[in-house]
Swiss-Prot record:
GO terms for molecular function: nuclease activity. InterPro entries: RNaseH-like_sf, YqgF, YqgF/RNaseH-like_dom, YqgF/RNaseH-like_dom_sf. Coiled coil: none annotated. CDD domains: YqgF. Keywords: Cytoplasm, Hydrolase, Nuclease, Ribosome biogenesis. GO terms for biological process: rRNA 5'-end processing. Could be a nuclease involved in processing of the 5'-end of pre-16S rRNA. Its EC number is 3.1.-.-. This is Putative pre-16S rRNA nuclease. It is an enzyme of class 3 (hydrolase). It holds the Pfam family RuvX.
């Protein structure tokens, strides 16, 4: 059993998908999607810190989008910046960067296979991508 839950994040330019682990650290469940505005530096960090405290989170896993050649592009740099902003606001939190290549595509495919409507997919995709990111990390622990 974990002492603290683990949060998974899929950071985009307009939304942050959030998933959370069960207390055993076996499964990831979608929790929420934060609306952000990266251009205006409105990153939802205060809301995220509230979620971390409310759910007794000890570790945050942030998806790190890499290019297929393993280099880090613009979105990857944005995720690393998000990590720094979160650490400034909450220095005691452990943050793990997790290779998230293809997680959004996998989430989209699973929603398509579940026959979820296009409108509903748009609402769920970021949260589902966060679930894929966190589940990958949890699986690596066991």
């Amino acid at each position: 059993m974990l002492q603290h839950k683990i949060l998974g994040l899929d950071v985009g330019s307009r939304t942050v998908g959030i998933a959370i682990s069960d207390i055993m650290g076996w499964t990831a469940q979608g929790l929420d999607t934060l609306r952000i505005n990266e251009e205006n530096n409105e990153l939802g960090i205060d809301q995220l810190v509230d979620i971390i405290k409310k759910h007794n989170v000890g570790t945050v896993v942030i998806g790190l989008p890499k290019n297929m050649n393993n280099s880090i592009g613009f979105r990857g740099e944005a995720s690393l910046t998000y990590k720094e902003k979160l650490l400034e606001a909450y220095p005691s939190i452990e943050i793990v960067m997790w290779d998230e290549r293809l997680s959004t595509m996998a989430a989209e495919r699973s929603l398509l296979e579940a026959d979820v409507s296009r409108q509903k997919r748009k609402q769920l995709i970021d949260k589902m991508a966060a679930v894929f990111i966190l589940q990958g990390y949890l699986d690596s622990l066991h």
